Amino acid sequence: MKLLAIIGLAALSIAGAAVAGVTASAWTAAQKIDTIGGNNAEVNTPSLDGCPIQSPDGLSLFIASNRPGGKGGLDIWVATRSSATSPWGAPQNLGEPVNSAADDFCPTPVGKGGLFFISREALPGACGQGDIYFTHRNGAGVWAEPERLLCSPAGPNSELDEQGPSWVDVSGKLRGKKMLYFSRSSAAPSVPGEIYVSERQNGARFGPATAVTELNDAAANDIQPNVRADGLEVVLSSNRVGTLGALDIWVATRANVGDRWSAPVNVGPEVNTSAAESRPSLSQNGGQLLFGRAPGPEGSSDIYVTTR
């Protein structure tokens, strides 16, 4: 099945599970995820573990890690559980064709078996340093060959490093659309991160990306957005003025999906520290926040969770 048809099915699944009545409220003290709830100790390792995000049904936890057993660099791994109240099992490597010898990270599961992710593999036709790809699992649970989204100016991928894709389908709401949020940045040459959005065009492919100006601070590095399922709250990583450490998690909201976002505010010291908090992601109901913290007490980056 082609990319667009799969995304369409994913959109129906997400739209059917949209959140109602959740507001941006205070978070509890964040905890290292493998130390609570009977979760498997291997969710975090002495390696780099980050980019955590749940599947819409809450039964799979996707992460990026450079732990032993991967294909090279950062790989995408997934832990599963039998119910939303059960502990997470040990993460398993997704293998090829998703993972490669290059960095493969920022997984974003959608619907029933769809997955956006970033790859820095230098394949023919690559747009830039890290591009957004989409893949899906077939009925046998096998991942299809990933498809790269179009290069700029026709599509969202650019010569820079795209990160943190976040798929939002609010097309059933007034002024609602099907959108893919993400960030662009570069370490060398140094280009500070900015948040962008690309609209899926009339059932066709994702179109040109535009900067979400109200979420961006020209003097800061704003990266890795994640939008709540109802499209009314977004979390992101930033080092803007007011940050407690190298990177903090910030949040913005809006009353309606067609409105501009509010000015981002720091989520506070229950979550943010003097370390770097990155790639935040909200659960489907908006009641849980996952993120990476670097350095962690165990590895160069560890996965944390908080609730509200």
What are the residue ranges of the model-derived segments?
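Short, conserved micro-motifs composed of acidic
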Residues: 20-308
